[in-house]
Structures are given as structure tokens and as C-alpha cells.
Amino acid sequence: MNILKFLCINCPANSYNGSGNVLKKNLFCCRFLAFLIALNILFAFLFGIAEKTRIKSGANVVNTTPSSPLPTVILDAGHGGEDGGASSADGLLEKDLNLSLALVMRDILTANGIEVILTRETDTLLYDRNVDFQGQKKRLDMAARLKIANETTNAMFVSIHMNTYPHPSCQGVQVWYSENNEASFELAKTIQSTAQELLQNENDRTVKRSGSSIYLLRKLECPAVLVECGFLSSPEETALLGDENYRQQLALTLCMGILRTIT
């Protein structure tokens, strides 16, 4: 199942609710479909130019595989287990939202031919229960996530998190990038712009360097970003994030940003 089929299955046929207002979900689907069509037209146009050039030059096609292999995308659902991360006023936990998004993203990317590794698939922190972990759970958890990335060839690391801020008016996706690999900036920029284009037209945030403030991005050498998917301090955005349909839209958007970067 490719991303277009996934989108069609998860978009209802009706376009209006009882009050006659266009449903946000359908607006997202229409916008997303239009974007995919435009992207396919662009690819077809570029392929046509390349094919004409090849024919004119008399070149023979020997190998049609990509010149460089697609990366293995590591989806890192932040927090887990005893570490709930941020929480909303009504008790929505960051760790649960992170995992929910990562699982949907895995299915979308896998359906589109991308190899995916999850740092966690359940509600747990990553530490060895057979050793003395007293007071070291978070450190061991970070080390385990780092090890997964470092042991993966041609990795691309995308960490999924939620945001919080004292002012409840703050909303929107915010992407941070590692400075250790120049491809991180392009990945972050593409995910951020895709979110703004397809889901959050009012979001005027720009990508940010992680510096030394984000442990994993500071340590990783592969392309690596951290996506703050929304503010649990915002009642309005919390309501959206708690809705499964919105999370599917958000997961699709993030995957589209990844796919635009690597394909």
C-alpha cells in the first residue's frame, strides 16, 4: 500500500458535516492529493527530459537502480515507560502520542519501500533490567537509542516528541537539526516546510540548530532531526493531538517530508 492509497483509505467520501462546513480532514486530504499530483507531474517531466537526453546521446541504460541506496529511517518515539515526557492539563502523555505517531509513520514509510527501524515499539524505556540501573534509567535509555542509530548502516534518524511552553497560545510543528551532518538541515527544512504547506498554513516557525541542548542530536553523526509535533500546553492543539484522525494527517505529513528528502 503506497502513500496515496493510505491517504484515500483514511479520507472519508463525504466533504461536509451536518452544519455545511468543510471538514478539516477533507481539506487536508484534498491539499495532500493536489500536492502529490503536482509532485508526480514534476517527476514525470524531469524523467522525460532525462530520457530525451539519453536517447539523443545514444547512451545505453545499464543499471536502473538509484545511484545511492535509500537510507534506513530510524523512528525514535521519545520517552516511554516510567518517563512520560510532557503532559497536557487533561492528562494526555507525550510518550503515548510519540509512539502512536511513530507506529503510523512506520507503516506509511514501509509501504513506500523505505526500511524502518523503531527505537521502541511499546511503552518502555530502553535499559537493561538485568543490571543495576538505579538512578541511571534515562542515561541508559539515551545510550541504547544512540547505539541503535550507530549500528545502522546509512541511517537517517527522526526523533518524535511533543512540546510545551508557559504560554498556551504557542502551537505548531518545530523541527530541530543536528549540526554534525549537513544533510540534517535539508531534512529538517523539508519536514518543516511540508508541515506548513499541508497541515499548518499559519505556522511561521523556522528550523533550529540543536547545539548541545539535545543529547542525541549532539552525538549522532548520521542525518538527524528532532520533530516537536505540537504543544501540549495549548488546549487547542492538545485536542487535535488527542484525535486519531489528526494524528494520521500529521504522520502522513511528516512522512511526506521524509520522502521528499530521500527520493
Where are the model-predicted features located?
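Catalytic-site microenvironment of enzymes
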Residues: 2-263
